Amino acid sequence: MLAKSPLKIVLCSPRGFCAGVVRAIDTVERALALYGAPVYVRHEIVHNKYVVDSLRAKGAIFVEELEEIPDTKAPVVFSAHGVPKSVPEHALSRNFFSIDATCPLVTKVHREAAIHFKRGREILLIGHSHHPEVVGTLGQLPAGAVTLIETAADAEAYQPKDPNNLAFVTQTTLSIDDTAGIVTVLRERFPNISGPHKEDICYATTNRQAAVKKVAPVVDAMIVVGAPNSSNSQRLREVAEREGCKVAVLVQRASDLDWSQFEGIKVLGLTAGASAPEVIVEEIMGAFAERFDLSVETVSAAEENEFFPVPRVLRPDAAE
Protein backbone atom coordinates (compact mmCIF):
# COMPACT_ATOMS: atom_id res chain seq x y z
CA MET A 1 0.00 0.00 0.00
CA LEU A 2 1.39 3.38 -1.05
CA ALA A 3 1.94 5.94 1.67
CA LYS A 4 -0.37 8.93 1.49
CA SER A 5 1.15 12.25 0.52
CA PRO A 6 1.20 14.80 3.34
CA LEU A 7 -1.30 17.67 3.13
CA LYS A 8 -1.68 20.58 5.51
CA ILE A 9 -5.20 21.99 5.75
CA VAL A 10 -5.45 25.57 6.99
CA LEU A 11 -8.93 26.26 8.34
CA CYS A 12 -10.16 29.85 8.15
CA SER A 13 -11.80 31.17 11.28
CA PRO A 14 -14.45 32.40 11.50
CA ARG A 15 -16.29 30.43 8.83
CA GLY A 16 -19.75 29.03 8.27
CA PHE A 17 -23.00 30.03 9.91
CA CYS A 18 -23.50 33.62 11.03
CA ALA A 19 -26.00 34.78 13.64
CA GLY A 20 -28.57 35.78 11.00
CA VAL A 21 -28.46 32.36 9.35
CA VAL A 22 -28.74 30.55 12.69
CA ARG A 23 -31.74 32.73 13.55
CA ALA A 24 -33.43 32.00 10.21
CA ILE A 25 -32.94 28.23 10.46
CA ASP A 26 -34.07 28.28 14.10
CA THR A 27 -37.16 30.22 13.03
CA VAL A 28 -38.28 27.47 10.65
CA GLU A 29 -37.41 24.68 13.09
CA ARG A 30 -39.20 26.45 15.98
CA ALA A 31 -42.27 27.02 13.80
CA LEU A 32 -42.31 23.32 12.87
CA ALA A 33 -41.99 22.35 16.54
CA LEU A 34 -44.76 24.71 17.69
CA TYR A 35 -47.27 24.40 14.85
CA GLY A 36 -46.34 21.16 13.09
CA ALA A 37 -45.90 20.59 9.38
CA PRO A 38 -46.29 22.13 6.95
CA VAL A 39 -44.48 25.41 7.42
CA TYR A 40 -44.28 27.40 4.19
CA VAL A 41 -41.10 29.35 3.44
CA ARG A 42 -40.92 32.03 0.77
CA HIS A 43 -37.62 31.57 -1.08
CA GLU A 44 -34.78 29.43 0.27
CA ILE A 45 -34.52 30.34 3.96
CA VAL A 46 -30.76 30.64 3.37
CA HIS A 47 -28.80 29.90 0.20
CA ASN A 48 -27.66 26.38 0.98
CA LYS A 49 -29.07 23.18 -0.53
CA TYR A 50 -28.08 20.98 2.42
CA VAL A 51 -29.93 23.26 4.85
CA VAL A 52 -32.98 23.57 2.61
CA ASP A 53 -33.17 19.82 2.01
CA SER A 54 -32.84 19.16 5.76
CA LEU A 55 -35.72 21.52 6.56
CA ARG A 56 -37.80 20.13 3.71
CA ALA A 57 -37.40 16.65 5.21
CA LYS A 58 -38.80 18.01 8.49
CA GLY A 59 -41.91 19.43 6.83
CA ALA A 60 -40.97 22.83 5.39
CA ILE A 61 -42.40 23.65 1.97
CA PHE A 62 -40.36 26.14 -0.06
CA VAL A 63 -42.01 28.43 -2.60
CA GLU A 64 -40.77 31.39 -4.60
CA GLU A 65 -43.97 33.43 -4.40
CA LEU A 66 -46.97 33.54 -2.07
CA GLU A 67 -49.29 32.74 -4.98
CA GLU A 68 -47.98 29.16 -4.78
CA ILE A 69 -49.38 28.74 -1.26
CA PRO A 70 -52.99 27.54 -0.88
CA ASP A 71 -55.30 29.19 1.64
CA THR A 72 -53.89 27.97 4.92
CA LYS A 73 -53.51 28.65 8.62
CA ALA A 74 -49.97 27.21 8.53
CA PRO A 75 -47.09 29.60 9.24
CA VAL A 76 -45.50 31.38 6.28
CA VAL A 77 -41.85 32.35 6.89
CA PHE A 78 -39.98 35.05 4.98
CA SER A 79 -36.32 34.25 4.29
CA ALA A 80 -33.23 35.78 5.92
CA HIS A 81 -32.59 37.94 2.85
CA GLY A 82 -35.61 40.19 3.44
CA VAL A 83 -38.62 40.86 1.24
CA PRO A 84 -40.22 43.86 -0.48
CA LYS A 85 -43.00 45.54 1.51
CA SER A 86 -45.51 44.15 -0.97
CA VAL A 87 -44.90 40.60 0.32
CA PRO A 88 -46.14 41.03 3.92
CA GLU A 89 -48.97 43.18 2.56
CA HIS A 90 -49.98 40.31 0.26
CA ALA A 91 -49.69 37.85 3.14
CA LEU A 92 -51.95 40.04 5.27
CA SER A 93 -54.53 40.30 2.48
CA ARG A 94 -54.76 36.50 2.46
CA ASN A 95 -54.86 36.26 6.26
CA PHE A 96 -51.62 34.29 6.37
CA PHE A 97 -49.82 33.80 9.67
CA SER A 98 -46.51 35.25 8.52
CA ILE A 99 -43.21 35.13 10.40
CA ASP A 100 -40.36 37.37 9.28
CA ALA A 101 -36.92 35.73 9.49
CA THR A 102 -35.15 38.67 7.82
CA CYS A 103 -31.67 39.09 9.27
CA PRO A 104 -31.67 42.05 11.69
CA LEU A 105 -28.64 43.48 9.88
CA VAL A 106 -30.66 43.53 6.64
CA THR A 107 -33.56 45.15 8.48
CA LYS A 108 -31.08 47.83 9.62
CA VAL A 109 -30.39 48.67 5.96
CA HIS A 110 -34.14 48.85 5.27
CA ARG A 111 -34.55 51.33 8.13
CA GLU A 112 -31.63 53.45 6.94
CA ALA A 113 -33.15 53.67 3.45
CA ALA A 114 -36.54 54.63 4.89
CA ILE A 115 -34.97 57.42 6.99
CA HIS A 116 -33.13 58.84 3.97
CA PHE A 117 -36.35 58.72 1.95
CA LYS A 118 -38.25 60.53 4.70
CA ARG A 119 -35.58 63.23 4.62
CA GLY A 120 -36.05 63.66 0.88
CA ARG A 121 -32.68 62.31 -0.21
CA GLU A 122 -31.84 60.49 -3.41
CA ILE A 123 -30.81 56.99 -2.34
CA LEU A 124 -28.15 54.79 -3.91
CA LEU A 125 -28.02 51.07 -3.11
CA ILE A 126 -24.65 49.42 -3.67
CA GLY A 127 -25.36 45.78 -4.48
CA HIS A 128 -25.94 43.05 -7.06
CA SER A 129 -29.10 43.19 -9.14
CA HIS A 130 -31.55 40.29 -8.77
CA HIS A 131 -30.07 39.14 -5.45
CA PRO A 132 -33.07 38.66 -3.12
CA GLU A 133 -31.59 40.98 -0.51
CA VAL A 134 -31.31 43.77 -3.08
CA VAL A 135 -34.83 43.06 -4.38
CA GLY A 136 -36.08 43.31 -0.79
CA THR A 137 -34.29 46.58 -0.08
CA LEU A 138 -35.42 48.17 -3.35
CA GLY A 139 -38.96 47.09 -2.48
CA GLN A 140 -39.03 48.99 0.82
CA LEU A 141 -39.69 52.25 -1.00
CA PRO A 142 -41.71 53.44 -4.01
CA ALA A 143 -40.41 52.50 -7.46
CA GLY A 144 -37.65 54.86 -8.55
CA ALA A 145 -36.78 56.02 -5.03
CA VAL A 146 -33.61 53.92 -4.94
CA THR A 147 -30.97 53.64 -7.68
CA LEU A 148 -28.85 50.48 -7.84
CA ILE A 149 -25.08 50.96 -8.13
CA GLU A 150 -23.24 47.73 -8.99
CA THR A 151 -19.78 48.94 -9.99
CA ALA A 152 -17.36 51.84 -9.66
CA ALA A 153 -18.25 52.67 -13.28
CA ASP A 154 -21.91 53.01 -12.24
CA ALA A 155 -20.80 55.36 -9.46
CA GLU A 156 -18.77 57.42 -11.95
CA ALA A 157 -21.69 57.66 -14.37
CA TYR A 158 -24.46 58.47 -11.89
CA GLN A 159 -26.02 61.91 -12.35
CA PRO A 160 -28.05 63.04 -9.33
CA LYS A 161 -30.77 65.66 -9.31
CA ASP A 162 -29.05 67.34 -6.35
CA PRO A 163 -25.45 66.32 -5.55
CA ASN A 164 -25.83 67.77 -2.05
CA ASN A 165 -28.85 65.65 -1.17
CA LEU A 166 -27.60 62.09 -1.63
CA ALA A 167 -27.32 59.00 0.56
CA PHE A 168 -26.11 55.44 0.08
CA VAL A 169 -26.74 52.06 1.68
CA THR A 170 -25.26 48.69 0.75
CA GLN A 171 -26.09 45.03 0.47
CA THR A 172 -24.71 43.20 3.52
CA THR A 173 -22.78 40.45 1.69
CA LEU A 174 -20.54 42.37 -0.71
CA SER A 175 -16.80 42.33 -1.26
CA ILE A 176 -15.24 44.71 1.27
CA ASP A 177 -12.66 45.90 -1.27
CA ASP A 178 -15.08 46.32 -4.19
CA THR A 179 -17.49 48.27 -2.02
CA ALA A 180 -14.73 50.47 -0.63
CA GLY A 181 -13.77 51.35 -4.20
CA ILE A 182 -17.34 52.30 -5.09
CA VAL A 183 -17.76 54.35 -1.90
CA THR A 184 -14.48 56.16 -2.62
CA VAL A 185 -15.79 57.20 -6.04
CA LEU A 186 -19.08 58.40 -4.55
CA ARG A 187 -17.39 60.38 -1.76
CA GLU A 188 -14.92 61.98 -4.18
CA ARG A 189 -17.73 63.01 -6.54
CA PHE A 190 -20.24 63.91 -3.84
CA PRO A 191 -18.44 65.00 -0.64
CA ASN A 192 -21.73 65.62 1.17
CA ILE A 193 -23.20 62.17 0.51
CA SER A 194 -24.66 60.52 3.62
CA GLY A 195 -23.61 56.96 4.44
CA PRO A 196 -24.35 54.52 7.22
CA HIS A 197 -23.10 55.35 10.72
CA LYS A 198 -21.77 51.80 10.85
CA GLU A 199 -20.86 49.82 7.75
CA ASP A 200 -23.81 47.99 6.16
CA ILE A 201 -21.58 45.07 5.12
CA CYS A 202 -22.17 42.74 8.03
CA TYR A 203 -19.66 41.55 10.61
CA ALA A 204 -19.78 37.98 9.29
CA THR A 205 -19.01 38.98 5.70
CA THR A 206 -16.17 41.20 6.93
CA ASN A 207 -14.65 38.58 9.23
CA ARG A 208 -14.84 35.71 6.74
CA GLN A 209 -13.18 37.78 4.03
CA ALA A 210 -10.48 38.88 6.49
CA ALA A 211 -9.70 35.26 7.35
CA VAL A 212 -9.44 34.31 3.66
CA LYS A 213 -7.08 37.25 3.09
CA LYS A 214 -4.78 35.88 5.80
CA VAL A 215 -4.85 32.30 4.52
CA ALA A 216 -4.98 32.59 0.71
CA PRO A 217 -1.38 33.84 0.21
CA VAL A 218 0.10 30.84 2.05
CA VAL A 219 -1.87 27.98 0.45
CA ASP A 220 -1.73 26.21 -2.91
CA ALA A 221 -5.51 25.99 -3.23
CA MET A 222 -8.59 27.29 -1.43
CA ILE A 223 -11.96 25.59 -1.07
CA VAL A 224 -15.00 27.66 -0.17
CA VAL A 225 -18.00 25.64 0.98
CA GLY A 226 -21.11 27.37 -0.31
CA ALA A 227 -23.83 27.52 -2.92
CA PRO A 228 -23.44 29.18 -6.34
CA ASN A 229 -26.32 31.55 -5.48
CA SER A 230 -24.75 32.53 -2.15
CA SER A 231 -23.38 36.05 -2.55
CA ASN A 232 -21.10 35.94 0.48
CA SER A 233 -19.66 32.55 -0.57
CA GLN A 234 -18.90 33.78 -4.09
CA ARG A 235 -17.16 36.82 -2.62
CA LEU A 236 -14.92 34.55 -0.51
CA ARG A 237 -13.81 32.69 -3.63
CA GLU A 238 -13.09 36.00 -5.38
CA VAL A 239 -11.10 37.28 -2.39
CA ALA A 240 -8.94 34.14 -2.45
CA GLU A 241 -8.22 34.65 -6.15
CA ARG A 242 -7.30 38.30 -5.63
CA GLU A 243 -4.93 37.37 -2.84
CA GLY A 244 -2.97 35.20 -5.27
CA CYS A 245 -4.49 31.76 -4.75
CA LYS A 246 -4.19 29.99 -8.12
CA VAL A 247 -6.93 27.44 -7.37
CA ALA A 248 -9.99 28.83 -5.60
CA VAL A 249 -13.14 26.76 -5.92
CA LEU A 250 -16.69 26.89 -4.58
CA VAL A 251 -18.24 23.52 -3.72
CA GLN A 252 -21.50 22.47 -2.08
CA ARG A 253 -20.51 18.93 -1.08
CA ALA A 254 -17.44 16.68 -1.11
CA SER A 255 -18.89 14.93 -4.16
CA ASP A 256 -18.41 18.19 -6.11
CA LEU A 257 -14.62 18.09 -5.72
CA ASP A 258 -12.58 17.79 -8.91
CA TRP A 259 -9.54 15.95 -7.59
CA SER A 260 -7.43 16.85 -10.61
CA GLN A 261 -7.36 20.44 -9.29
CA PHE A 262 -5.56 19.32 -6.14
CA GLU A 263 -2.78 17.17 -7.61
CA GLY A 264 0.59 18.02 -6.13
CA ILE A 265 -0.67 20.51 -3.56
CA LYS A 266 1.01 20.70 -0.16
CA VAL A 267 -1.20 23.24 1.64
CA LEU A 268 -4.98 23.66 1.29
CA GLY A 269 -7.10 26.50 2.64
CA LEU A 270 -10.67 25.71 3.68
CA THR A 271 -13.52 28.04 4.61
CA ALA A 272 -17.31 28.18 4.40
CA GLY A 273 -19.80 30.88 3.55
CA ALA A 274 -22.19 32.24 6.15
CA SER A 275 -24.99 29.90 5.05
CA ALA A 276 -22.87 26.72 4.88
CA PRO A 277 -22.99 24.23 7.79
CA GLU A 278 -19.85 22.95 9.51
CA VAL A 279 -20.90 19.37 8.77
CA ILE A 280 -19.96 19.95 5.11
CA VAL A 281 -16.53 21.29 6.11
CA GLU A 282 -16.05 18.07 8.09
CA GLU A 283 -17.28 16.01 5.13
CA ILE A 284 -14.70 17.64 2.85
CA MET A 285 -11.91 17.14 5.38
CA GLY A 286 -12.93 13.48 5.56
CA ALA A 287 -12.69 13.17 1.78
CA PHE A 288 -9.16 14.62 1.82
CA ALA A 289 -8.20 12.35 4.74
CA GLU A 290 -8.95 9.34 2.53
CA ARG A 291 -6.34 10.52 0.02
CA PHE A 292 -3.79 12.45 2.07
CA ASP A 293 -1.98 12.28 5.39
CA LEU A 294 -3.53 15.36 6.96
CA SER A 295 -2.31 17.92 9.43
CA VAL A 296 -4.64 20.75 10.39
CA GLU A 297 -4.03 24.33 11.46
CA THR A 298 -6.56 27.10 12.16
CA VAL A 299 -5.91 30.75 11.31
CA SER A 300 -8.24 33.22 13.02
CA ALA A 301 -9.11 36.75 11.93
CA ALA A 302 -11.75 37.55 14.57
CA GLU A 303 -13.80 36.19 17.44
CA GLU A 304 -17.57 36.09 17.00
CA ASN A 305 -20.22 35.96 19.71
CA GLU A 306 -23.20 37.63 18.02
CA PHE A 307 -26.64 36.18 18.73
CA PHE A 308 -30.02 37.16 17.31
CA PRO A 309 -33.16 35.77 19.01
CA VAL A 310 -35.92 34.26 16.88
CA PRO A 311 -38.95 36.43 16.07
CA ARG A 312 -40.98 37.26 19.17
CA VAL A 313 -43.98 35.14 18.18
CA LEU A 314 -41.79 32.01 18.46
CA ARG A 315 -40.21 32.79 21.83
CA PRO A 316 -41.32 30.89 24.94
CA ASP A 317 -42.59 34.09 26.56
CA ALA A 318 -44.74 35.04 23.55
CA ALA A 319 -47.89 33.53 25.06
CA GLU A 320 -47.40 35.19 28.44
Swiss-Prot record:
GO terms for biological process: dimethylallyl diphosphate biosynthetic process; isopentenyl diphosphate biosynthetic process, methylerythritol 4-phosphate pathway; terpenoid biosynthetic process. Pfam families: LYTB (PF02401). Pathway: Isoprenoid biosynthesis; dimethylallyl diphosphate biosynthesis; dimethylallyl diphosphate from (2E)-4-hydroxy-3-methylbutenyl diphosphate: step 1/1; Isoprenoid biosynthesis; isopentenyl diphosphate biosynthesis via DXP pathway; isopentenyl diphosphate from 1-deoxy-D-xylulose 5-phosphate: step 6/6. Keywords: 4Fe-4S, Iron, Iron-sulfur, Isoprene biosynthesis, Metal-binding, Oxidoreductase. Its EC number is 1.17.7.4. Binds 1 [4Fe-4S] cluster per subunit. Dimethylallyl diphosphate binds at residues 47, 81, 131, 230-232, 275. The active site is at residue 133. Its cofactor is [4Fe-4S] cluster. GO terms for molecular function: 4 iron, 4 sulfur cluster binding; 4-hydroxy-3-methylbut-2-enyl diphosphate reductase activity; metal ion binding. (2E)-4-hydroxy-3-methylbut-2-enyl diphosphate binds at residues 47, 81, 131, 172, 230-232, 275. InterPro entries: LytB/IspH (IPR003451). It catalyses: isopentenyl diphosphate + 2 oxidized [2Fe-2S]-[ferredoxin] + H2O = (2E)-4-hydroxy-3-methylbut-2-enyl diphosphate + 2 reduced [2Fe-2S]-[ferredoxin] + 2 H(+); dimethylallyl diphosphate + 2 oxidized [2Fe-2S]-[ferredoxin] + H2O = (2E)-4-hydroxy-3-methylbut-2-enyl diphosphate + 2 reduced [2Fe-2S]-[ferredoxin] + 2 H(+). [4Fe-4S] cluster binds at residues 18, 103, 202. Isopentenyl diphosphate binds at residues 47, 81, 131, 230-232, 275. Belongs to the IspH family. HAMAP family: IspH (MF_00191). Catalyzes the conversion of 1-hydroxy-2-methyl-2-(E)-butenyl 4-diphosphate (HMBPP) into a mixture of isopentenyl diphosphate (IPP) and dimethylallyl diphosphate (DMAPP). Acts in the terminal step of the DOXP/MEP pathway for isoprenoid precursor biosynthesis. PANTHER family: 4-HYDROXY-3-METHYLBUT-2-ENYL DIPHOSPHATE REDUCTASE (PTHR30426:SF0). This is 4-hydroxy-3-methylbut-2-enyl diphosphate reductase 2. It comes from Rhodopseudomonas palustris (strain ATCC BAA-98 / CGA009).
